């Protein structure tokens, strides 16, 4: 394995940790409606379990309203049940093949709970980033031991890996701060 491929792999995997973190945060409900709120929900359709966005179109017609247009009339009840049983505290209103989902105001207690969950997601992303750093450091030590790179080069590269790790964790913290203010903003 070459130094370039090790560094490229580290960048790719650290970027992946940030992407996964952003995706998890997208599922957290803030005061604003977002189609990503319903994306993780599954429904039984045609003998298998699929995500809601595979049987319906999710849109945001108003800031505090979600609209779900189910493509198959027989699926309306299952989609409504999945939303109601999701634990998100949502109550869909059925209108033919469309479901309108008003988002209730978040109370202070629920906001604090959501911030705690966001912090847990951030910590998972930081841990994933540190695991990537450890793998990179191990690979550099292996290259040094095999004589492919010198001690000075290995030291310089390990500093680059640490810098990349610090930047990634700083990005995670920035994203968390934005999400936290979004959740707590009334």
Curated annotation (Swiss-Prot):
Coiled coil: none
Pfam families with a match to the protein in the record: RRF
Any one GO molecular function term: ribosomal large subunit binding
Keywords: Cytoplasm, Protein biosynthesis
Domain of life: Bacteria
Annotated family: Belongs to the RRF family.
Protein's name in the database: Ribosome-recycling factor
Organism, scientific name: Bartonella henselae (strain ATCC 49882 / DSM 28221 / CCUG 30454 / Houston 1)
């Amino acid at each position: 394995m070459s130094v370039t491929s090790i560094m490229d792999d580290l960048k790719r995997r650290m970027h992946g940790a940030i992407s996964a973190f952003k995706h998890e945060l997208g599922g957290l409900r803030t005061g604003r409606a977002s189609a990503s709120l319903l994306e993780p929900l599954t429904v039984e359709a045609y003998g298998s379990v699929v995500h809601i966005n595979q049987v319906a179109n999710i849109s945001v017609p108003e800031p505090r309203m979600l609209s779900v247009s189910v493509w198959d009339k027989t699926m309306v009840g299952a989609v409504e049940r999945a939303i109601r049983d999701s634990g998100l505290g949502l109550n869909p209103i059925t209108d033919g093949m469309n479901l309108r989902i008003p988002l209730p105001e978040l109370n202070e207690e629920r906001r604090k709970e959501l911030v705690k969950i966001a912090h847990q997601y951030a910590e998972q992303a930081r841990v994933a980033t540190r695991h990537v750093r450890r793998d990179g450091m191990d690979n550099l030590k292996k290259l040094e031991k095999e004589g492919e790179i010198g001690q000075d080069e290995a030291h310089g590269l390990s500093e680059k890996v640490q810098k990349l790790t610090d930047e990634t964790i700083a990005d995670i913290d920035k994203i968390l701060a934005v999400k936290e203010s979004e959740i707590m903003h009334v």
